[in-house]
Amino acid sequence: MTTRSGTRERKDEPNVPLPTLLTQAKDIAIERLHQRLADEGFEGIRYVHGSVFRFIDAEGSRLTMLAERSGLTKQAIGELVGELEDHGYVERAADAGDRRAKIIRLTDQGKRAQVAAARILTDIEQRWSRHLGGDQVALLRRALEEVIALESG
């Protein structure tokens, strides 16, 4: 079976590499997140837009800062900001400290989408907790945090 994101479910195959399982779990969670966002009226949000939503400061951020934080190029972030701007999630405003620079800020719609996404991700985690048990989810969280710390250097 293939998910909408194109990820093939392989739960019946033995010895699937752990990184593959992690990718599949992430893909399923992200697919559910985006479907629920769309169901709630937040259209046009894609996975890659998280590079803006996750790294933007409450008071707004410069494009260069978003690029630095996300690890994307300034051009790539600029395109993502343009897409989000077209959907009404962000706006560009003059930077009070430098009139030549622009600050990217979440609009009210963008703030609502960010709050909705956080709530939906919490719902997904709670679903996992109900199915696996709170102790198992806490153990999974700790193990993943340790792997991330190990691999981040």
Please give the residue ranges for each predicted region.
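Hydrophobic residues on short alpha-helical segments
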Residues: 19, 53-54, 114
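Charged, amphipathic alpha-helical coiled-coil/dimerization segments
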Residues: 3-6, 35, 82-145
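N-terminal leader segment of winged-helix/HTH proteins
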Residues: 1-44
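Short, hydrophobic-biased segments on the C-terminal half of alpha helices
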Residues: 64, 81-82
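N-terminal helix-turn-helix DNA-binding core of bacterial DNA-binding proteins
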Residues: 31-76, 153
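Alpha-helical structural segments
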Residues: 24, 28, 57-58, 123, ...
